Regions:
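Acidic two-metal-ion nuclease catalytic site recognized across multiple nuclease folds
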Residues: 184-231
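Acidic, Mg2+-coordinating catalytic module of metal-dependent nucleases/exonucleases
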Residues: 88-93, 97, 101, 105, ...
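Short alpha-helix plus adjacent loop in nuclease-associated cores
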Residues: 118-145
Length: 231
């Protein structure tokens, strides 16, 4: 599996850019085999969103004086990913955020935008897995509450609450490490849920599960509220 995370200049995948990539290749026991981390400088036409830069702990020196260009960062990333071969790409909130940036960034650089779903590759999102885990096994992963008393699934809050402390939050490689540790906890405590979640990591395998099971459960999230459905 490849656990990856991107840090960006903002939330708009159409206009913002990736500034840091962190990725870790693991075996089936979540042990690190190899890793990749790199930063790049701002593209000339990009104005970073201040809050994003504060959260990512990036300085103007990082953004303007880093030797690596944006294209070179993507080129190095793709070279590393290809060397790792076919894999399941797993991130945290990756389907709605990181994957959007990856797909559009590859397209803009004239590369195959569907890296994580072509050539035998698969993709999954640990945020959705943790949400499902909370519905079916609520005591296995501790979920904090925000200031409004609602469940908060932010990685930098969930990880330390579950004993994961040796990682640099809001750093691409640090968040990839935290994602691995949380995935390992779920696999140890609820292996059936972990295995079931990976059965929907491709369109074909998802369709197969739907066709082969007359009854199954899915979870959806609406405005922060997790709702299970029997289908």
């Amino acid at each position: 599996d490849i656990f990856d995370d991107f840090k960006t200049t903002g939330r708009e995948s159409n206009w913002d850019q990736i500034i840091q990539v962190g990725a870790i290749l693991t075996n089936s026991n979540f042990q690190e085999i190899d890793k990749f981390e790199a930063r790049c400088r701002l593209q000339p036409d990009i104005i970073p969103y201040p809050k994003a830069i504060l959260v990512n702990k990036s300085s103007m020196i990082d953004l303007t004086q880093t030797n690596l260009s944006h294209f070179s960062l993507i080129e190095l990333m793709m070279k590393k990913f290809k060397s790792w071969g076919t894999a399941t790409y797993i991130g945290y909130n990756s389907i709605s955020f990181d994957e959007e940036f990856l797909r559009k960034t590859l397209f803009k650089n004239l590369l195959n935008p569907y890296l994580t779903i072509n050539n035998g590759n698969k993709r999954s999102d640990l945020l959705n897995i943790i949400r499902a885990n909370h519905i079916y096994y609520p005591d296995s992963i501790k979920i904090p509450l925000n200031e409004k008393g609602k469940l908060s699934f932010k990685l930098d809050q969930i990880a330390p609450l579950n004993g994961i402390k040796n990682f640099n939050a809001h750093d691409a490689l640090g968040d990839a490490i935290a994602t691995i540790k949380l995935a390992e906890i779920i696999n140890i405590q609820n292996p059936r849920l972990w295995e079931a979640s990976l059965l929907t990591s491709t369109r074909e395998s998802t369709e197969k599960e739907i066709d082969n099971n007359k009854l199954f459960c899915i979870t959806e999230t609406f405005f922060g509220k997790i709702m299970p459905f029997v289908v």
